[in-house]
């Protein structure tokens, strides 16, 4: 009896699949380079098996077996990650958590909801909407991503400026450690009982444990949104103005600023042709909405030109369209033809570094890409994220891949030199692992490696992900 047969005897029938189509589907995630390789016909090996547990106990059984046999495990939510965090290996098994999709108790008094980690975001929001609630966590991938994926990649929703990122929504969790032991962290608003173990697992991308259940904070669901939109001739002026709006505590849950290229992409349907665009979105409900909107309007009007609420309404209606466009370009359809690769780079830095980050990264990407666009979308009192989209056109797929690697290398180096972080909410995966030592420093990289080794001495958890290239 093989080790996989032994595991199968410990799990419900049908939990393990070695069907070729299933293995093929689980071979990659949504990393653009992996998608390029697939559509050009590269042989991308699938895992040895796909295991689809339905409970925390079943996950514990799988990891205990994997630890005993030395089998690598690749946790997977919905496969929407864009950094290669769920790339299969023929010697590994993929732990597909999509069957763990139960939405549990909603505590109306505390405004919390218990969920399994395989619950998709759009389904969760539909269920909460029936109760007049929302998590307030709206990533662009909400329809194709899971709660577990949000935690693993340290997700930030489109309303994070007002509602916070996933670490602000996550109150408690259950996770299975690499040896099969179950870790339960009760839901509380905050704790000083030592280092925050919940926060340790946020952004860990399945390298330290598998999160199986979570308790999330909820809030009253906005019934409507009010929008402001202003045009700016200069991106630096736009960024400075949005910083002022953010610090004025106007209650804008959405603050976004587009450079001219991104504004043309996002608002071309409104006949927008020149200049940058700033958006501010205000959820109804909190008192004093009119006064707060007036305060934001005064700040924006001092340096910008009013464009009208239709810009915000258009963005809200089409805010997730890029997911479909990405699939059309990088999928079998190859809407832009062969030799084309599109990707995003979401960095972040202090306000004092934002102009330098914008200029240096845009210049670095433009040296290899045919188009580069950028927007600010997650704003803080101390700084902001900068979300770059870039399109590379090569003479063929191999040339496009070479240009892609060069673009990432030069842009990541530029980000570090300008004082930014190479990822704000997409995670590290395999794509950004080579840049981790520069990001964390040699000592920081050693700390991360030691923590990981303490939890996973056998090195079975998602090998290749978040592996700093340091001297041992």
Question: What kind of feature is each model-predicted range?
Answer:
Residues 1-64, 81-111, 260-269, 314-342, ...:
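N-terminal flexible segment immediately upstream of the FAD-binding catalytic core
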Residues 12-13, 416-428, 452-453, 457-461:
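Alpha-helix capping/hinge segments and adjacent helical runs
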Residues 17-36, 220, 226, 231-410, ...:
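C-terminal substrate-recognition/cap domain of FAD-linked oxidoreductases
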Residues 102-256, 460, 472:
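FAD-binding subdomain of flavoenzyme oxidoreductases
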Residues 181, 432-472:
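Activity-critical C-terminal alpha-helical subdomain
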